[in-house]
Amino acid sequence: MRMLNLSRRALLAALAMAAPWPTARAAPRRIVSIGGAITETLYALGAQDELVGVDTTSLYPAAARTLPSVGYARQLSAEGVLSLRPTLVVAGEEAGPPPVLRALEAARVPLVVLDGGHRFEAMVERSVRLAALCGRDAQGQALAQQVKAQWQSVRERVAALSRQAVPPRALFVLSHAAGQMRVAGRETAAHAMLGYAGAVNAFGEGFAGYKPLTPEAVIAVAPQVIVATEQGLEATGGVDGLLKAPGLAQTPAGQTRRVVALEALLLLGFGPRMPQAVATLAEAIFTPLPR
């Protein structure tokens, strides 16, 4: 009987040693997203519950607007970001100013600045990398496959439209409630989107970046369609207000009131909705222009 009790105790001890110790559950991530496309991608990956703060460009989906704001991406406050106790800050290349980013690093907050690039492939790469940062590799691969399939369909549609009509000369106008209107040259998000949609940027050969709109230059390039953001068009008083800008009313686009406007983040954000943006833009600029 004594040996039996000893064996039982030994067996129980052995089982206790073999049983796995309960592990502490990892604390949830607290992500601050600085960039509308980054926020949009986090939602597409299903990581929205880990978001604790966003910047003012994070307008899609609508639920993102209910999150605490850290302000404008280019004018961040270190105190504002740190007050949200983030365990990860993900930002686009436009985030700043640099002293604020250095302050975040000095506070030992993990900061990842994602590469920009106005290409479809760059958007996919950013999405996959963002998924890896959130421990959502499978969701990242699924999202990549989804947008690639959409992109293939869109490219085929744009090619078909380009065969049916002459690619139009398009002018992208960036406007705000205050300040002079600017037009897009090459090496801009607008230039890339116009090209993907099958249009020719009216200032694509003239200069890089954005420059103030001047009547002489606009009349000289004779755009057939004007592209703007919905926010910019509203700020200038709609189509009527936009065409009051010197020179625009004298262009072919102005004379026919050919103005196409898309929501800013959709058009210029280079997020997961990029195929949708290109498809919408292409249909709008090609439909009324038969060969």
Regions found by a protein language model. Give the residues of each.
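His/Asp/Glu-enriched short active-site or ligand-binding loop at hydrolase and phosphoryl-transfer sites
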Residues: 184-210, 230
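A short, structured surface patch at a secondary-structure boundary
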Residues: 29-100, 202
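N-terminal export signals
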Residues: 2-5, 10-26
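Short helices/loops that flank or line small-molecule/ion binding pockets
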Residues: 79-85, 213-222
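A ligand-binding cleft/hinge motif common to bilobed small-molecule-binding domains
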Residues: 97-106, 225-243
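Extracytoplasmic substrate-binding proteins
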Residues: 27-30, 99-178, 201-204, 208, ...
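Short secondary-structure boundary segments
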Residues: 35, 93-94, 116, 206, ...
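Alpha-to-beta junction loops
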Residues: 85-89, 199, 221-226
